[in-house]
């Protein structure tokens, strides 16, 4: 007869009417009993012949991707002018006095951040924008281009101008000013390590290992520039740097880089001086043929025997006869002035050699599940975390649940700040740019690759015969709709572009590490400035706590002003005031301890409602189920050990079948969640120890010992001794000399014992006692004779490796222990 849920509960000692613990508990360590229970609950039967179930509620296999939904009306989020102050360390020192070594080291790490991949693989431009939405190719192309353009305008990306130069918007940092070049030509490279063979040959060489020795390169670049005492302004030709992309008001000669004429071929004379025969886009297709070369003065290009120059693909339609009702020439003729073919940034900079390629693809998705009106750019630089040359990203401490509770469970009022576009605050050194390239090959190539009717041959690309091969009803309708949104920008966006990251991108494993270092250093500074308050951060989530609401508001004002003075952008609409229970990292943390947030509890209920019984479930779906249940496991009676059968099936990659009893057991576990309470400091006065054959306890001056019926593995014996000590004394601080018991991970013990021990020892804190000093050592060996002196072992709750309370420097801080905020009387009012 299968084991019923009631029997199973009684077996696990979860009911009160169990016999004496010293007899019942060792029985659960018996391997034979564990095997029989596993067979009864159908936990060990992994080889099943029935087809597997691949979907449980919303859970599908871990690797089956949910199809993202394209929204043609996505808004591109705006990025304020994010510019983190370069002298951030100096500003923090003005605020709080000298910084600690830890804070300084973390802030230096991101000023600027550096990225050293082992090998960079360059991909053709066609891979720049991923064809993620086959139904909405053109729409997705323009939306993504617009997003990239917005990022470039906000100073988050560099735009590759030539192999060795890039332009950007926003305020330059000092390391970018060292690398600025002014009116001297881009290719004057007789001296220094940047000299290279001519562009054509170097670009067509294979880019398999083009990692530059960046450390030495940065030094060279800086040294070469030190001799020249140029300021930014002095370096720039008064004529060579007009605001590009703005048509001059006069009707005289045209100073725009891209002229109004249909061919887009001529440059103004002063531009020609600043940029000798250099193409803005030396783009190459994967086969090595030139795709488009814009803005080359025709005489110089031809005289140097370069490839033929093709005029602008978009504007060519103006001079051609419409091929049908859906010809693109109808759209091109809508406007007289389509603006420039390319825009250029406010500042120019020399870069290490940057091929006309990309290193990662981009696509758009919803900003988050609750906000589908705005888009988010997904950047895939996964090449750096895969294969033989993968970069092993630095590890960083994530506070565990107990540390988090010890730290934040208090009677403070809480408020959380939202840092807008947190990743894009941290600047990257320009030498990293050639490794983090995104972009697109231009609309013509994009459409040509993906449309079925285009007969595109390399030798006749850009010529008139196949210009109209692009025309199709779908493209025409899409462009007409997009024209309403983007207007004359359609022309700009239809050109190829290559952009490199100037701030840290989200798709690289280094970025979360750097962000965590940055925000933890800033919070450490804030905590020392306001010693009676608490500031804590995890990634871009920053929380502030204070004793009273009015106190919290003034702290909020002071901290916000401080963060703004550093150049950190906060999103005021998303500041949340939590009262006394803080919502943070998926938990609700109050003075009673922590519990999972409500939406997670609802998800768990939903999961159990849909969970089928007696049907084999695909192990990938089990991974999803364990992911959800594992998050809430610390709040249940039996904790992680209860999920061990599921872990075992995932490890062996077999299907798992829920028996009615096991499902009822889990269901009951997760219906009643107990808060994880904060640990309190105290003195340890109860000690436990064991040998394979016996156990011993010391409770104050009382000592006890006992023997096991059969010898047990030492870790199991130590765990049993700890359980006896807890149930006999009721003390919540125990001393033990066993590291496994100390770790409170009971998943490696026999399954039934692990589940029962987790419930008995829930909320117990352990202190390590070396065996030689453990008062329970003698009783465990059967000797009750001599009593050792009792140790006074203090227990201090841990806050993990979050390096929270940085020691204040010895220099007295010049800020008194209170919040400063400008009184309106002192600031606004003037005596008459």
Curated annotation (Swiss-Prot):
Residues 186-229 are annotated as: Disordered. The keyword Transferase applies. Residues 346-589 form the Reverse transcriptase domain. Activated by host HSP70 and HSP40 in vitro to be able to bind the epsilon loop of the pgRNA. Because deletion of the RNase H region renders the protein partly chaperone-independent, the chaperones may be needed indirectly to relieve occlusion of the RNA-binding site by this domain. Inhibited by several reverse-transcriptase inhibitors: Lamivudine, Adefovir and Entecavir. Its EC number is 2.7.7.7, 2.7.7.49, 3.1.26.4. Residues 178-335 are annotated as: Spacer. Residues 1-177 are annotated as: Terminal protein domain (TP). One of its GO terms (molecular function) is DNA binding. One of its GO terms (biological process) is symbiont-mediated suppression of host innate immune response. It catalyses: DNA(n) + a 2'-deoxyribonucleoside 5'-triphosphate = DNA(n+1) + diphosphate; Endonucleolytic cleavage to 5'-phosphomonoester. Residues 336-679 are annotated as: Polymerase/reverse transcriptase domain (RT). Keywords: DNA replication, DNA-binding, DNA-directed DNA polymerase, Endonuclease, Host-virus interaction, Hydrolase, Inhibition of host innate immune response by virus, Inhibition of host RLR pathway by virus, Magnesium, Metal-binding, Multifunctional enzyme, Nuclease, Nucleotidyltransferase, RNA-directed DNA polymerase, Transferase, Viral immunoevasion. Gene3D superfamilies: 3.30.70.270. Mg(2+) binds at residues 418, 540-541. It comes from the Viruses. The record marks 63 as: Priming of reverse-transcription by covalently linking the first nucleotide of the (-)DNA. Belongs to the hepadnaviridae P protein family. Hepadnaviral virions contain probably just one P protein molecule per particle. HAMAP family: HBV_DPOL (MF_04073). Terminal protein domain (TP) is hepadnavirus-specific. Spacer domain is highly variable and separates the TP and RT domains. Polymerase/reverse-transcriptase domain (RT) and ribonuclease H domain (RH) are similar to retrovirus reverse transcriptase/RNase H. Multifunctional enzyme that converts the viral RNA genome into dsDNA in viral cytoplasmic capsids. This enzyme displays a DNA polymerase activity that can copy either DNA or RNA templates, and a ribonuclease H (RNase H) activity that cleaves the RNA strand of RNA-DNA heteroduplexes in a partially processive 3'- to 5'-endonucleasic mode. Neo-synthesized pregenomic RNA (pgRNA) are encapsidated together with the P protein, and reverse-transcribed inside the nucleocapsid. This is Protein P. It comes from Hepatitis B virus genotype D (isolate Germany/1-91/1991) (HBV-D). The lineage of its organism: Viruses, Riboviria, Pararnavirae, Artverviricota, Revtraviricetes. The gene is P.
